[in-house]
């Protein structure tokens, strides 16, 4: 099991909070969003963490290197982050996506530790977790073996 984190975006709507850093480096209660997420993932002993970077990518990678994460981290660069979206960033990581079961995260999320455990413990082959307070289209795709 691996994790892919999409962290290439500019976070324009956060204005001055992201002028010189990525959205996932914004701090909430004194902890950067990416710091919290990486430590939550680290406790699950996954095989690797793939992070797609773009805007302020060098700064983000340097910051992550200071966190002491022991799980191997692989970086994928989205050079046209300012013209694309998360689907494009995910496509850039497709080679990794095909190699292992994957937990996919957007880098600016805050969630309880139990959320990852619920995903890992669920017996279904394909699963999506969404915010219950927002309308969305959610479906479970059948297994290719069915």
Residue ranges and their predicted role:
Residues 23-33:
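Short catalytic helix/loop segments, enriched in acidic residues and glycine
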Residues 105-106:
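Active-site acidic Asp-centered loop
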Residues 1-18:
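N-terminal nucleotide-binding beta1-loop-alpha1 segment
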Residues 10, 21, 56:
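A generic "binding-loop/recognition-motif" signal
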Residues 112-146:
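Conserved core of the sugar-phosphate nucleotidyltransferase
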């Amino acid at each position: 099991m691996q994790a892919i984190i999409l962290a290439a975006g500019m976070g324009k709507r956060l204005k001055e909070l992201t002028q010189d850093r990525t959205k996932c480096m914004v701090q909430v209660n004194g902890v950067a969003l990416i710091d919290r997420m990486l430590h939550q993932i680290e406790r699950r002993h996954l095989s690797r963490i793939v992070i797609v970077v773009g805007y302020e990518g060098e700064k983000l990678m340097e910051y992550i290197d200071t966190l002491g994460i022991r799980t191997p981290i692989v970086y994928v660069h989205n050079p046209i982050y300012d013209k694309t979206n998360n689907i494009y960033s995910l496509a850039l990581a497709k080679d990794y996506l095909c190699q292992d079961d994957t937990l996919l995260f957007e880098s600016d999320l805050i969630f309880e530790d139990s959320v990852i455990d619920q995903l890992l413990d669920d017996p279904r082959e394909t699963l999506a977790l969404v915010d219950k307070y927002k309308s969305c289209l959610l479906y479970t795709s059948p297994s290719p073996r069915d």
